[in-house]
């Protein structure tokens, strides 16, 4: 027959030791994350989706994708004609005039403002190029060359210098008579380098045609004097009496 002591019968709780308390605390601290990771996969998926959504939408970018797209406005012929006439009057339109044009042409004021900005830039490019629009066919073909603009400016400057020089030609005294208009109509000049006749003219100083003629006349007169025989009959020594004469 099994015997029981008084403590087991009364049911006095046993006080846990220090080792048991530390082991229990460690088990309670490590078990919840492990159980949550293996038994709650939807929470991890939801957290990843939220992080991806936060990275896709910038907090300072409130614009939609449709607002970021810009479409080119197709102007009608009447609208372009009206805008061109207004641009001929004044390059910079006031807000009042812009509002009147917007109401007349059924266009937004922002579109009219952008059109005038682009038109001013186009006019500035034409003024810098120094050419009237539209270009002649030869000049248009010449301007297709990447280096054509620089070469055309150099040729035009050299031709203007030669036209005011003593030779009255396009390039001075070299005998060439190319005018600025003819120089601009040469669409296939070499893109690199500088014309050889221009470099030759830059090293030579322009000389006056009168000086050349005078030097030539001096040379010819000296040659004639050397080749002409000396006539002693008309010299003053022959007409004077000789000191040894007996008369």
From Swiss-Prot:
It is found in: Nucleus. GO terms for cellular component: nucleus. The keyword Cell inner membrane does not apply. Residues 194-247 are annotated as: Disordered. GO terms for molecular function: DNA-binding transcription factor activity, RNA polymerase II-specific; RNA polymerase II cis-regulatory region sequence-specific DNA binding. Residues 194-209, 233-247 have a biased composition (Low complexity). Keywords: Developmental protein, DNA-binding, Homeobox, Nucleus, Transcription, Transcription regulation. Residues 68-127 bind DNA. CDD domains: homeodomain. InterPro entries: Even-skipped_HD, HD, Homeobox_CS, Homeodomain-like_sf. GO terms for biological process: cell fate specification; negative regulation of transcription by RNA polymerase II; regulation of transcription by RNA polymerase II. Transcription factor. Involved in motor neuron fate determination and maintenance, acting as a transcriptional repressor to counteract gene activation by transcription factor unc-3 in a subset of motor neurons. Probably acts by binding to specific promoter elements. Required for posterior-specific pattern formation in the embryo and may have a role in regulating egl-5 expression. Belongs to the even-skipped homeobox family. This is Homeobox protein vab-7. It comes from Caenorhabditis elegans.
